[in-house]
Amino acid sequence: MSKFGHIHLHTVYSLLDGYCKVKDVVKRAKEYGMNFIGISDHGTLAGIYEFDNACRAEGIKPLIGCEVYFTHDVNEIVKSKDERNEIAWERFLSATGTTDEEYKKTTKKAKLELCKEYLYDTKGYHLILIAKNQTGLNNLIRLTSEANDIAMFNGRGHVDYSLLERYNEGLICTTACISSVVNHNIRTGEIEVAKLHIAKLQELFGDDLYLEIQPLDWEEQVFVNKEAMKLSKEFNVKLIATTDVHYTNKEDDYEHDILLCIGTGKLYKDPNRMSYDHEFWFRTEAEMIDAFNRNNYSDEEHNLYREAMNNTIVLANSVDDNIKVGADKELLPHTEVPEGYNSDSWLSRQCWLGLYKYLTDNNLMDQRRVYEARLKEELDVIITKGFSDYMLIEQAAIKKGTERGFGFGPGRG
C-alpha cells in the first residue's frame, strides 16, 4: 500500500489543460496501491460526479476539490479596463497628495505610467479547496457557482477573501503551485506579503491549511519549497507534497503540449508559446521521492518532504468517507396534468394530437405510418428515461414565451 496519494490532479475537465481521463487515472491510482485520490480541476466541479463514481467502483476514496482562481477583490476585477485605470489614478493621487488639476496637461499614456504600481493585479492566483465533509462540498459548489456568476474575468470565475469567509466551513485549503497567491510572493521575494496571506488563510481554515511543495526540477520551485518549509515552522502549518498532475503517463507530455497549443491558439513550433516542463505525470511514491532527491536539499529538508508526502494521508483521513456527490432523488419538478392522466400519458396524448394535426394541415396523412413509427420510438425513449415532465415544462415555457412574442428555434438538440 502506498504511503502517498495525489491530491492535486487535473482531469480532462480542466478544459484544454488537463489530459487525465478519469477512469484511466483512477485505475492508475489502484495499480500504484493508492487508496485515495483527489480531483482539483481549474475553476470547475464538472468532473466530480464521474470521478466519484469511478473511485468508488475501484474501492478508492475520492477527495472532491477544485483549484480556484483567487483575486484580491471580486468587485474590482469585473470592472472595465478604463474603470480600473481610473481607480489606479485616484489611488496615485491619494498616495502622492496631489490633485487631478496638477496633471491636466498630462497625456493618458503618461498618467498610466505614473500610476502603474497602483493598477489592479488581474492575475488569477491558484488555491486548492477540498471538501472535508458534506457541508464543505455544498459550500464548494456554492463558492464556484458564485465565482462564475459575479466574478468572471478572462473566461474564469474568481474568488476573494470575502467569498472564502462566506464559504470556508468544511473546506481544506492547500497553497497549490508556484502560481498561488502565497507561492507567487515567495517566488518574487515578497516574503512578508506571503506571510500576510498565510496568516489570513490560517485564520480562515485553521488546521485545515497546508503549504504545498512539489518535487519539480525548477530552480524557482526548489526555492519556494525551501521557503515554504521555513514558513511551515514559523506558522505551525502542515506541509503537503503534490506534483500537479496534468496527464496520466510520462509519455503523454507531447499530447498535453498539443492540448495547450489548442487552448492558447498557438502553433507547436512557436518558441514563445505556453509550455510546461515534462514533469506533470501521475508519479508513483518512489518517483515522488526520486524527483525530490535530485535537488540540493538538506537532511532536515528531506525529512520534511517525507513528512509532507505522509500528510497526504493525514489530509485524506480527515475527509469524511461518505460525502454524497449528486442528489438522492430526482430534482426535476413535476408538472400538473388534467385528472385521469399522469405525465407520461398526458405527454403522449399531446404529441399524438399534435402529430395528426400536422399531418392533416400539411396533406401528409398518406405518409402517417412513417411519422407514427418515429413518434412511437421517440416517446418510448423519453418515457423510459423519465423525461416526460421535462418535455412538458419545455412545452409550457415555449407556449408562454410565444404568447409574449419571443422567437424559438427548431430545438433539434
What residue ranges belong to the model's regions?
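Short active-site oxyanion
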Residues: 35-37, 126-127, 236, 405-408
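Non-catalytic structural connector segments
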Residues: 2-3, 68, 81-82, 182, ...
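Phosphate/diphosphate-binding loops
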Residues: 61-64, 74-76, 113-114, 118, ...
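A short acidic-Thr-Gly-centered motif at the start of a beta-strand
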Residues: 119-120, 230-236, 397-404
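Domain-core and long-helix interface of multi-subunit machines
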Residues: 2-39, 43-58, 93-103, 110, ...
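A residue-level signal for conserved active-site and pocket-lining positions in enzyme catalytic cores
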Residues: 41, 62, 133, 140, ...
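Conserved phosphate/anionic-ligand binding catalytic regions in large, soluble enzymes, centered on
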Residues: 135-136, 176, 240-249, 401, ...
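Hydrophobic or amphipathic alpha-helical targeting/insertion segments
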Residues: 44-153
